[in-house]
Amino acid sequence: MKICIISFDYWNYDHHIVKKLQEKGIDASHINMGAYKYKNFGERASNAISKIFLNKNIKHVKRQEYVVNTLKKLGPQDQILVLNPHTLDYQTIKEIKSYTPYLISYLYDNLERFPIEEKLELFNKIYSFEDKDVKKYGFEKITNYNYLSENPIQAEEIENDLFYITSYDKRRIKLLRKLTVRLSALEVRSKIVVVGKQVWKEKLKQLSSSKLFSKYIQLRKTPIYIDEVLDEYKKNKVILDLMRDGQEGLSFRVFEAMAFEKKLITDNPSILNYDFYDPQNILYIANDLELLNESFFDTPYKRIPTELFRKYTLDNWLNKVFGLEQTLNEKKITLYSS
């Protein structure tokens, strides 16, 4: 079986899908749009001029060409999965569809943030982690996945009580300002990192605002590699998870916390409806930061049952999205019949 994954793998999550498929003996490939680079300085300068004067992003066009040209080299696929297809034009997706009888999409952002309504008709199956989009458009519900092993290596020493890394987002920044006051009152040792090109705005605000925010929050323009993030998780008791505006689906932090057996603090109310929710492990704070107290940090993590843990693994996710168990069973029946 040949399966191709097409995505803009910014945080390097999607390559785990390909790796796990290959471990299952499937001929899997990954077309990562984020891997496309300018050929030279002239191409970069040309794109900058085009964006300013023609309102046209040549790099966006080149990425589409990169996807199609790579797919031509790979040839026909049994299944193709496109993650968050807002980065692809209608015609590009239509051409991708010509290479497979079964085109799938997984949306791990809501359609309010990245509208793609006009492209939905091109897909044979669409999965989404957002309940409201599932209800409105008839998508199939699926969560993000735990891509880590069942027994990941833990740190020898815990350095902090709480860790959080996030891309720059106005809503999150607003909540973090309130949160730093509470963390300070509780004397919680924490490391919070905000990443993005827009962090300069916060750096300007810090010149005239409370020093408490700058004491607790690190602002940086360049991203932190996922391996570094995972190392930080190991060295902390609790992982913080704050939603984007309009988000209901569970972020990867939830499943990373599950894998490392770390407690979780979140403002996402949908987590209360999941079968793995346990108030000893997960603190839902909503708008009431008074719920954040020392006892949550002091009590140990309560290990969830193995069967429940495996329900949210990448292995189980792949079986559902690509129908792998059904395919393998059909192969067994064919071999038995012959």
Indicate where each model-derived feature is located.
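Nucleotide-sugar donor-binding catalytic core of glycosyltransferases
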Residues: 2-23, 27-53, 62, 84-87, ...
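Short N-terminal targeting/anchoring amphipathic segment
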Residues: 5-6, 69-87, 104
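A short, well-structured beta->alpha microelement
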Residues: 56-71
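Short amphipathic alpha-helix with an adjacent loop that forms part of the alpha/beta core around
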Residues: 68-74, 153-154, 291-299
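Active-site proximal beta-strand in glycosyltransferases
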Residues: 81-84, 96-110, 127
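Pol beta-like nucleotidyltransferase catalytic core
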Residues: 259, 263-338
